[in-house]
Structures are given as C-alpha cells and as structure tokens.
C-alpha cells in the first residue's frame, strides 16, 4: 500500500533511507537497506511497520507509527501525499517484537550481559542427555537454559540480575537473581513465576528455616511451599482439585526450581550433603496455593500477620502427604477427634514433641467445621486439646515399644 508513497518520498526527500525487514528487493524500484538481522529495527525501537522517523544530526526529532495520512503530510510537508490511499491503516507488528525472536534480539543487541559461565556442547551431542550426564537434573529432563530463555525469565523481575540474594547452602555459594533465573528456566517456569521462586529461596535460606539441616538429616523431608495472595490466581496456581498432585505448571515448576537451585548452585545433591535415607516424591517439588477465596477460614498468611492482598510464601519442612479418611463425621467434635487420632501417629505415636504437621482440609471436611461456626483458631484448639495424653503412655518402654520420651515426662 505504501509503495507509491515511498517512491514519492524518495523523489522529494533525497536524504530518505528505507529499511526492509524481510524482502531486500522491496519496494520495487526503490533503493533500500536490508534489515534482515533486525539490528536497525531493534535500536530504533520499531514496534509497528511502517514507521516514519525524522532525525536531525543523528537525533530523532519526531516519528509517526502506521499510516495516518494527516500525520505523514504534516511531518513531510507534502500536502497531497497519499491522496489515493485510505486516511488510516494501523500497520503491522514489527518483526523485531515478534515473541519468537525478541529474546534472541535482546541478547544480541540489548547490551545486557549474562555473567554465569556458559557451557558449550558439541554439535553431535544431545543437549538433554548432556544435562543428565553432567548432573544438572533432578532425574527428569530439564529445559536447556539458553541465553534467550534466561533473558526472557529475567523479565519476570525488576531486580538486578547480579544482585546476590543469599549464600546458597550447603556450600554457601553466592546465589544471584541470574542464577535463580537459570534454574527456573531449567525447571520449566514462566517469567511470571520468578518472584515466587525468589521468595521461596529467600525463605528457606534463613537460619530460622535452615535448609542445610533439612538436607543433612536422614529423615524423608523437603521444603513444603505454601503460597497465598492474589498473585497465586494471576499465575494460575492450583488451590483446588488435585492440589497436591500433578498437572499444574506453576505449582510443580516453582517447587522444582527451588530444588534445582539448592542442588545445582548450593551443592545439595543426594548421597552427598543430602543424606535422606528414603526421601519422598515431594523432593522433586512440593508447592501449592491455599484457596484464599473459597476457604471458610482465615488464610494461613493472614493468620501469620499478613494482609489478604499481599502475596506470601510460607515454607515448612514436611514428609510426603498422608490421607485422613472420615466420611461419616457430621459433627465438628467427631471430625476433630479423627484428625487428632491421625496426627498422633506422625512419625511415631510416642514422640509428640518432635514433629509438627500441616493440615490441609478439603471442602467437605471444612464445611463440617464452618457449619458449626468454628473458626480456624477453634479448629486448631479443639484438635490440640484432643492430642493431650498421659506421659506414662509415651515414655520409653510403654506399650511394648522401646521408642518414646524420657522418663522425666512421665506424668
């Protein structure tokens, strides 16, 4: 459509330079500069074609995007320019903003440099198999963290890629935002998941949580990452059916990224510092969202002092999930009794001081409590009261079991 306009501009504006992004012979009969590598388009920040730019002494003074006849006439000073054309056409998206290649262009021309050591593969090597053979995976295939993918991941945060977030245990290696992004790529995260990965890493690498201790124990435990806030819905986290299972990208890849970071950067590999005797599948990923909107109770985050509008991450050291079955209880007291009986057996029924638990209620059980107007605090207190037991029943040797608490706790 703009060929006649370009031809006329070439005649009346001798200093005009025409750039073409794809066909170097376009437009016919007009001398043009090929921009097949899109360098000129990238540096000129071209969003739409055609774009008409005026420069004075190398500095842009004005531009118009797409075809708006009145603006082209005003900028060029040609009163009858494009008389045969429609008044307005929006133009087409520039190839330099094509989602399939924009990350490659950012690496080539964006001036941003990745500082992590790059590993080159031989042309005959299978990149997925090499990631296995070099020990970069958790036993499942990982996404190769190309510079383009890492740059795309970094777009998920405004933090400086070279900011040191923590010293990653167990080897206490400087963990930068860039290295977090690399492992998030490998885990399969989208850029919008990156802030959640960063928050979880910041949480587990505190003295209070002590991820080094979680790794070094022989117990089958791993970080359980519980997410709250409107951001969980924005990124599509699962807080409903199959909440602890497979099938949700955000849940699985956020948790997986955290595990890969501790393995690949911190050095927490199984059989080395990671001394778990059995482990459990949650050591691949154990991350889920609470149903903030559907729950009849105060959310975990709010109960811990946060506002419901805030996005939060809570981390807990947990073993694999276990099922609590009670299909008959219709009174809250009955259901609380069931929960107490099941919780009493966590790890060992005679070691009540040693272990904590996270209780995840499904809608049916939650409804029993809600219909009785029990608050979150009431549910916890009722279960706690039912977990009391005589010290004589849990000391070492009682009930024919050597395990138990010390004799000093006997009544």
Predicted regions and their residues:
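Non-transmembrane, aqueous-exposed alpha-helical and coiled segments at domain scale
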Residues: 108-411
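A short glycine-leucine-enriched loop at secondary-structure breakpoints
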Residues: 43-47
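Iron-sulfur (Fe-S) cluster-binding modules
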Residues: 82-115, 122
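Non-catalytic, surface beta->alpha helical segment in thiol-disulfide oxidoreductase systems
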Residues: 48, 53-88
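Short acidic, S/G/P-rich loop/turn micro-motifs used as interaction or catalytic elements
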Residues: 1, 25, 61, 365-368
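Typically the conserved alpha-helix immediately C-terminal to a functionally engaged Cys/Sec
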Residues: 2-14
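Conserved beta-strand segments of the P-loop GTPase G domain that flank and frequently precede/overlap
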Residues: 1, 19-21, 360
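Thiol-based oxidoreductase modules, predominantly thioredoxin-like and allied folds used
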Residues: 14-38
């Amino acid at each position: 459509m703009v060929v006649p306009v370009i031809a006329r501009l070439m005649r009346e504006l001798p200093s005009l330079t025409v750039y073409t992004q794809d066909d170097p012979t376009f437009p016919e009969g007009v001398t043009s500069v090929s921009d097949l590598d899109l360098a000129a388009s990238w540096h000129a920040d071209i969003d739409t074609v055609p774009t008409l730019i005026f420069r004075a002494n190398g500095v842009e003074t004005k531009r118009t995007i797409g075809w708006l006849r009145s603006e082209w006439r005003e900028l060029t000073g040609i009163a009858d320019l494009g008389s045969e054309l429609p008044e307005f056409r929006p133009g087409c998206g520039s190839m330099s903003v094509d989602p399939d290649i924009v990350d490659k262009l950012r690496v080539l021309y964006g001036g941003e440099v990745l500082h992590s050591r790059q590993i080159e593969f031989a042309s005959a090597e299978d990149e997925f198999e090499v990631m296995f053979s070099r020990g970069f995976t958790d036993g499942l295939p990982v996404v190769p963290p190309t510079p383009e993918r890492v740059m795309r991941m970094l777009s998920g945060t405004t933090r400086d890629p070279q900011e040191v977030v923590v010293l990653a245990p167990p080897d206490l290696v400087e963990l930068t935002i860039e290295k977090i992004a690399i492992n998030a790529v490998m885990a399969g995260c989208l850029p919008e998941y990156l802030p959640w990965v960063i928050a979880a890493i910041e949480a587990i690498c505190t003295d209070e949580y002590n991820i080094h201790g979680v790794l070094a124990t022989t117990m089958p435990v791993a970080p359980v990452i519980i997410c709250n806030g409107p951001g969980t819905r924005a990124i599509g986290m699962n807080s409903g059916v199959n909440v602890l299972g497979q099938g949700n990208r955000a849940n699985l890849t956020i948790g997986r990224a955290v595990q890969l970071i501790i393995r690949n950067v911190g050095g927490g590999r199984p059989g080395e510092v990671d001394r778990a005797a059995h482990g459990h599948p949650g050591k691949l990923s154990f991350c889920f969202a609470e149903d903030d909107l559907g729950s009849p109770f105060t959310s975990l985050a709010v109960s811990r002092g946060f506002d419901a509008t805030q996005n939060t991450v809570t981390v807990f050291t947990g073993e694999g999930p276990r099922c609590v079955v009670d299909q008959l209880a219709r009174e809250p007291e009955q259901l609380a009794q069931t929960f107490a009986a099941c919780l009493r057996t966590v790890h060992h029924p005679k070691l009540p001081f040693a272990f904590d638990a996270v209780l995840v209620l499904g809608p049916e059980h939650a409804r029993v409590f809600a219909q009785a107007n029990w608050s979150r605090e009431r549910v916890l207190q009722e279960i706690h009261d039912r977990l009391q037991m005589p010290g004589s029943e849990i000391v070492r040797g009682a009930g024919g079991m050597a395990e138990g608490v010390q004799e000093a706790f006997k009544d």
